[in-house]
């Protein structure tokens, strides 16, 4: 078992994210995992992730607040415990259009070369 306390989770910089704090809960710099890593993103009001293709298969789960996820031009509003699965390469952006922070659980598969 590998425990990561939120207070000790490594922070990292997510490229093209603005007004978003990110921490790694499992995997990568938080400790080895075999197939995926898990992170938590805190989107402040107005926080965004610019449009970018997903590098690997990805799952988002909103733990608190509301986020607008745009995938290939179609907007979807996600609220408490809503989730979305993105295949590798799907073009997505994320925006917090509310006046309160939103928490997003992020799970991303490791590249196939790392899993093998």
From Swiss-Prot:
One of its GO terms (molecular function) is hydrolase activity, acting on glycosyl bonds. Keywords: Cell wall, Glycosidase, Hydrolase, Secreted. Residues 40-107 form the Cupin type-2 domain. Optimum pH is 8.0 with pNP-beta-D-Gal as substrate. Beta-D-galactopyranosidase that specifically recognizes the beta-glycosidic bonds formed with beta-D-galactopyranose (beta-D-Gal) or N-acetylgalactosamine (beta-D-GalNAc). May target the galactoside linkages in the exopolysaccharide component of the mycobacterial extracellular polymeric substance (EPS) and help dispersal of Mtb bacteria from a deteriorating biofilm. Disruption phenotype: The knock-down strain shows significantly lower biofilm dispersion compared to the wild type. This is Beta-D-galactosidase Rv1717. Its EC number is 3.2.1.23. It is found in: Secreted, Cell wall. Induction: Expression is probably maintained throughout planktonic growth at a certain basal level, down-regulated during biofilm growth and promptly up-regulated when dispersal from the biofilm is imminent.
């Amino acid at each position: 078992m590998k425990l990561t306390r939120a207070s000790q989770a490594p922070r990292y910089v997510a490229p093209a994210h603005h007004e978003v704090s990110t921490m790694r809960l499992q995997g990568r710099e938080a400790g080895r995992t075999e197939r995926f890593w898990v992170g938590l993103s805190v989107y402040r009001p107005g926080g965004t992730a610019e449009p970018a293709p997903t590098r690997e298969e990805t799952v988002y789960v909103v733990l608190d607040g509301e986020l607008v996820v745009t995938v290939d031009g179609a907007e979807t509003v996600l609220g408490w415990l809503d989730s979305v699965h993105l295949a590798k390469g799907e073009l997505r952006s994320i925006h917090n259009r509310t006046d309160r922070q939103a928490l997003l659980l992020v799970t991303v598969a490791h590249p196939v070369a790392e899993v093998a």
